[in-house]
């Protein structure tokens, strides 16, 4: 029979692939060629050769009909595919089990969805990777000699070629398995205690068993923002959950009082994403007095490129099996009492894993040298963002309704124009066209025959990487500017863009305000790898709305204030729409808006990193850095270039693109100029200022080649795990400038807010902060702003050390009417 048989030492560790590669089929050997080299690279740092494993594969002979589905993870054990040829699948499973019996592995690494399904009855290998699992019950009963084999799922090797970050996770998973091939594994159920406190006596008994904790972890579960239970862990060994809604009535007064009194104690408290839990607990009258840590924030400080969810952190820092679907898979309708019991254990497990994770994270932070940065620059600004989240902006509802009428009319008019430009087609639904990537792709590439632009997309459920046609704004602008010559098609493409922008504006204007008439936002401190925040609607607030049929549904309150365009949306022809959107935001009676921002902050940092110190004075004296840059590109006297001239815009955008190593294609999207013209612009820019490439870019590339790590002046660290290609370098070029400016505004913002408790702070935008203050305190605020915001940045800690202290000047604008009418404050 034409089978691929396993090979390797008859001991210890078994490595099981799912479907062999073409080379493996050709040579009738598992784990050879590129796959073997990948595992060798992963294990190199551990000084372990994968050829010391017994290596085999699940599918030992070809099955042509299923080859494509298997490679794309589109299969399940006992699904339609397996049912189509059950004898084949059973044969493969029997052969693998026979190998297990012969080899008697202590640990088996399995790659692929189907082996996971078949051997453990688990689904979704991306969730279970890194877990330590047991074989399925029926296998353990039928074949008791292999009942103690530990199963550790790994992400399929073919997926790791596409995403280098996954190889780091695999290294951690392999390290865990190798450890337990040499020592005894004690199941977490035998090491940890998870209980439920149904009475105050239960809760006090738990507290007495650990009277002096180094820190405690608290976790809450919610339903529609109502607390359902609270979990506590004090020692990383035992955790307890307290039912909150479904307490027994006879225990409710004493148990609630016991919990509230305990939360009020100033014990150092740690949580996963504590901002949400603290916000909810504060709303319910139980604020946490001593917040000392957050596993999500520390995870971002340690490895900003990694996932930050508790499920991932559990997989790399603990031996606890993936459990985040335990409650979801059961469903409350199945058995309400069993559901509640499982929910409470799930809640306690969250508190337990958070405690275990944080202790190991602290050790990692000490080893990597970021513990001081975390304690001084990350956790202290937690309160700043909690305050911003609770502020919001007052909305002028009459102005909002006026703008809605205006932009709905604009959308209808442009949709009518679009219909008139196109012949009827059964594949186009005019009611859903603009918001449907599938229909827009059909219209652009099939109906009009435009040159195809595609991108790679990863299916978050299966991990499948597939190439899809691009229909986003950048792709359409690229077609308009560089790819399409037909003016009629360009007009259609431009109209699609315009309609999309109007649709986006309308959707934003329909964003629900809270019952107090204010629009809110919610900041995420781990928003980007650079340390910049991101923002979204509030997860802790929603409004009930009616649909067209009168049915009620929930809609989150708020929006990302960071993404609201200050000057509207720019169209390919350079015109603007939506430049009046901020008119809906008004100050409270007696208040004014005042916004301060760092002047050309990132460009100044790049200039320092480029060691072009002679250029720094031009940022603050005539003709100004952008006029000077424009003169390099268009020639002439920089003093004669006006801010309204197209040359000024070219200079401004060319500096941004040149600083971060962008190519002519990206600059073309930014400027709406042709690819050829942008090539010339960048050539002239780098010829006039070669220090950016020769000093700054060179230094970044050298640092990545030498250690893959960049450290900012404030001590923020990022390790780059991806391929060292042009995309990675571009990301690295922007890291230090963006991170430095963001951390500068945060350190100053924290002090500013502490010294102005009378001010409201609704928005932070990376290099700027908006405040709403009493009119009579304007001068006091300006003085505070200058005192806190214009502080020197020392580059001695930076990867690219520079002997200079950079002070970034700031600019202020203010308004008494609305946020759209900000004017310079002299």
Give the location of each predicted region.
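Metal-dependent phosphoesterase core characteristic of DEDDh/y 3'-5' exonuclease domains
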Residues: 36-40, 46, 120-138, 147-151, ...
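Polymerase palm active-site segment centered on the conserved acidic dipeptide of motif C
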Residues: 284, 400-434, 438, 685-700, ...
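Short active-site loop/helix that positions an aromatic residue
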Residues: 230, 274-286, 296-303, 317, ...
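Conserved catalytic core of nucleic-acid polymerases
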Residues: 383-390, 516, 520-521, 525-528, ...
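Acidic beta-strand-to-loop metal/phosphate-binding motif
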Residues: 106-112, 217, 267-277, 593-595
């Amino acid at each position: 029979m034409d089978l691929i048989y396993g090979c390797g030492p008859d001991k210890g560790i078994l490595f099981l692939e799912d479907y062999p590669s073409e080379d493996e089929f050709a040579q009738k050997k598992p784990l050879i060629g590129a796959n073997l080299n990948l595992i060798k690279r992963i294990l190199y740092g551990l000084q372990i050769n994968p050829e010391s494993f017994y290596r085999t594969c699940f599918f030992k002979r070809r099955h042509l009909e299923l080859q494509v589905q298997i490679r794309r993870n589109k299969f399940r054990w006992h699904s339609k595919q397996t049912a189509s040829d059950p004898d084949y699948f059973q044969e493969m499973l029997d052969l693998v089990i026979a190998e297990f019996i012969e080899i008697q592995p202590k640990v088996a690494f399995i790659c692929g969805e189907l082996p996971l399904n078949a051997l453990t009855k688990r689904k979704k290998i991306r969730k279970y990777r890194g877990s330590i699992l047991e074989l399925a019950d029926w296998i353990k009963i039928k074949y008791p000699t292999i009942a103690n084999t530990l199963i550790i799922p790994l992400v399929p090797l073919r997926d790791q070629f596409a995403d280098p970050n996954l190889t780091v996770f695999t290294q951690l998973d392999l390290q865990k398995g190798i450890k337990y091939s040499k020592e005894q594994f004690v199941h977490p159920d035998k090491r940890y205690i998870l209980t439920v406190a149904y009475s105050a006596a239960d809760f006090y008994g738990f507290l007495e068993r650990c009277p002096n904790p180094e820190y405690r972890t608290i976790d809450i579960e919610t339903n529609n923002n109502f607390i359902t239970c609270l979990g506590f862990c004090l020692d990383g060994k035992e955790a307890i959950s307290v039912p909150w809604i479904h307490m027994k009535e006879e225990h409710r007064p004493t148990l609630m009082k016991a919990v509230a009194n305990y939360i009020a104690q100033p014990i150092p408290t740690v949580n996963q994403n504590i901002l949400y839990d603290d916000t909810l607990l504060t709303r319910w009258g139980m604020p946490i007095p001593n917040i000392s840590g957050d596993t999500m924030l520390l995870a971002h400080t340690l490895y900003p490129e990694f996932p930050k969810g508790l499920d991932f952190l559990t997989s790399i820092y603990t031996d606890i099996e993936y459990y985040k679907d335990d409650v979801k898979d059961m469903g409350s309708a199945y058995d309400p009492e069993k559901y509640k019991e499982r929910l409470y254990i799930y809640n306690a497990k969250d508190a337990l894993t958070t405690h275990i994770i944080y202790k190991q994270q602290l050790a990692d932070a000490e080893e990597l040298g970021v513990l001081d940065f975390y304690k001084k620059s990350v956790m202290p600004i937690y309160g700043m963002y909690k305050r911003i989240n609770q502020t919001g902006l007052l909305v002028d509802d009459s102005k909002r309704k006026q703008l809605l009428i205006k932009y709905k009319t604009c959308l209808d008019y442009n949709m009518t124009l679009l219909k008139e430009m196109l012949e009827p087609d059964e594949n186009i639904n005019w009611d859903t066209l603009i918001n449907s990537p599938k229909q827009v792709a059909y219209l652009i590439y099939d109906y009009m025959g435009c040159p195809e632009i595609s991108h790679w997309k990863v299916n978050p459920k299966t991990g499948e990487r597939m190439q899809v046609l691009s229909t986003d704004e950048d792709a359409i602008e690229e077609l308009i500017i560089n790819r399409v010559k037909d003016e009629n098609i360009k007009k259609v493409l431009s109209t699609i863009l315009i309609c999309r922008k109007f649709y986006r504006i309308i959707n934003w204007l329909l964003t629900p305000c809270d019952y107090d008439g204010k629009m809110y936002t919610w900041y995420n401190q781990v928003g980007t790898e650079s340390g910049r925040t991101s923002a979204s609607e509030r997860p802790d607030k929603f409004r009930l709305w009616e649909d067209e049929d009168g049915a009620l549904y929930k809609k989150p309150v708020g929006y990302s204030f960071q993404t609201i365009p200050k000057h509207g949306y720019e169209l390919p022809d350079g015109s603007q729409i939506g430049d009046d959107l901020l008119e809906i935001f008004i100050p409270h009676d007696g208040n004014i808006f005042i916004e301060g921002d760092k002047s050309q902050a990132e460009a100044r940092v790049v200039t320092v990193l480029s060691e072009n110190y002679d250029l720094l004075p031009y940022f603050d004296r005539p003709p100004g850095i952008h006029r000077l840059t424009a003169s390099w590109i268009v020639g002439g006297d920089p003093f004669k270039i006006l801010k309204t001239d197209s040359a000024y815009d070219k200079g401004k955008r060319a500096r941004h693109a040149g600083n971060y190593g962008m190519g002519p294609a990206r600059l073309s999207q930014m400027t709406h100029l042709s690819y050829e013209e942008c090539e010339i612009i960048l050539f002239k820019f780098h010829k006039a200022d070669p220090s950016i490439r020769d000093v700054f870019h060179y230094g970044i590339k050298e640092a990545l080649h030498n250690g893959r790590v960049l450290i900012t002046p404030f001590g923020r660290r990022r390790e780059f795990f991806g391929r060292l290609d042009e995309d990675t370098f571009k990301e690295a070029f922007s890291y230090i400038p963006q991170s430095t400016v963001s951390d500068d505004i945060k350190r100053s913002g924290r002090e500013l807010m502490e010294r102005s408790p009378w001010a409201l702070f609704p928005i932070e935008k990376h290099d700027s902060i908006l405040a709403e203050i009493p009119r009579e305190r304007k001068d006091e605020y300006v003085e505070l702003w200058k005192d806190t915001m214009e502080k020197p940045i020392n580059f001695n800690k930076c990867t690219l050390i520079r002997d200079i202290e950079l002070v970034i000047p700031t600019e202020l604008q203010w308004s008494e009417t609305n946020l759209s009418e900000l004017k310079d404050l002299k």
